[in-house]
Amino acid sequence: MTDSPLCGVIAAIATAIDATGEPNCAQSLALARFLLDNGCDGLNVLGTTGEGTSLSLRQRLAVMNAYAASGLPLRRLLVGTGAAALDDAVTLTGHAAALGFAGALVLPPFYYKGVSDDGLFATIEAIASATAAQPIPIYLYHFPAQSGLPWRVALIHRLLESFGERIAGLKDSSGDMDFANEAAGLSPRFRVFPATEAALPQARAGRFAGCISATANLNADLCARFYRSGDGAALAQAMAIRQLFDGKPLVPGVKALLAHIHDEPQWARVAPPLSPLAAADRTAAIAGYDAVRAKRVA
């Protein structure tokens, strides 16, 4: 297994949806190229912002195939492969490995709540065993507010002890920085990515590997200026864009602004059960974004 280079500013890239409810791979890939050319060190494909859990196994495999055929550098792409059904998670993770993605981001199997750490351990054990011939790095996706199941620090330690470098890191969408710091302290090689640009100062200092952020779809250039040169004004603007969605639905909000930024109204489509951003919220987000962008970073 080669060492994954994933670090820095990683956008949890949105997935374009066409009028029939299918992923629009061409539009998604155009955004991927734009983001990689404008500040992103990497991309997280088919995560929460990418609506991966709203897409079928067939659709997710098709999106992965499109990325693999695109010529984009898969060594910079992490792909969501978690699923409620273990066989689906194994299939997705194995396909990601065969295609050459840099890592597989694995949600816990999220339907049953209150399951034991032993059950979650067994899930990762099965995925790791099934992909042993092509040992893609596994990144744990910690988002208990959505999944209802945490990757507890003690369990992560157990996984590291059992599977070594296969357990490469963690995306932490909990917002609990104490947890993120504790997880980051488990091993020097265990890469932790909080899900907010606010963690970039600690990433620059070496505590975290970077961030994996939904709003990096919109502000990656600003995040990159801070991450690479310590430009505090750029980070302040990046955070101002993120804060436009405080108390609002994040994924519809990001997609509404993508429609505005790229002048492509179809970007505002979301897959059920999500709904497009309300008109008043969309107007406010656009006005707020334009106001932030009007303040040039020196």
Feature names for model-found ranges:
Residues 11-14, 38, 207-208, 215-298:
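C-terminal alpha-helical cap/extension of soluble enzyme domains
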Residues 27, 59, 119, 175, ...:
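Soluble or luminal CAZymes and related metallo-dependent hydrolases
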Residues 2, 161-162, 262:
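Short, conserved catalytic or adaptor-binding loops enriched in Gly and charged residues
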Residues 21, 59, 181, 274, ...:
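Solvent-exposed, flexible loop/coil residues
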Residues 2-148, 167:
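Active-site beta->alpha loop and helix N-cap motifs at the rims of alpha/beta catalytic domains
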